């Protein structure tokens, strides 16, 4: 069984408890979502695509805060989509989809976002590239920074290994060649940092903005365990 099948089975098994396990009003993802909600008017966002919607929390909160916003979520796991439908979302608001191959044209959505998704994907740069392609104005990512997690010693060791570009090899050794870990709380997870895709996003955006969503020091790469990133491709000169 490969990791995609393992993750599929994990979500099917835990779908009924998904919200209780993963959604909390005081967690880092909701902190990031609150920030995004505050940027919608500033950026004059009229449409949003949410990649990896799960049961649709982001869709529901965006609709609640901005009723006239066009919001679409894609989620590959049917069991999670079904939970979303039972909570009031329609099949036109939450649809099947693959973040590595978004079935939309360039610029179809003003903003494309992903909350806690990329650390579940073996090649997250493919999803990020697709997000950048489909986004007309901006992308927003909320996810882990593995290099800012753990004790000071652990962070220093990981950052040193990464400095010499040996992190992929070290991670393979750590995971005994799999490249991922499986936990009851998160299913299949890869060692991921938002900073791994920083250069790709920087090249496609006019401005880039980073926010620590958990307590951290001034150097976010070194100290922040979780990061929100807003990449603005273009913005109106007088958005307000």
Q: Which residues fall in each region the model found?
A:
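A short glycine-rich, Lys/Arg-flanked "PGG" loop and its adjoining helix->strand segment in the class I
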Residues: 125-137
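Class I SAM-dependent methyltransferase SAM/SAH-binding core
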Residues: 56-101
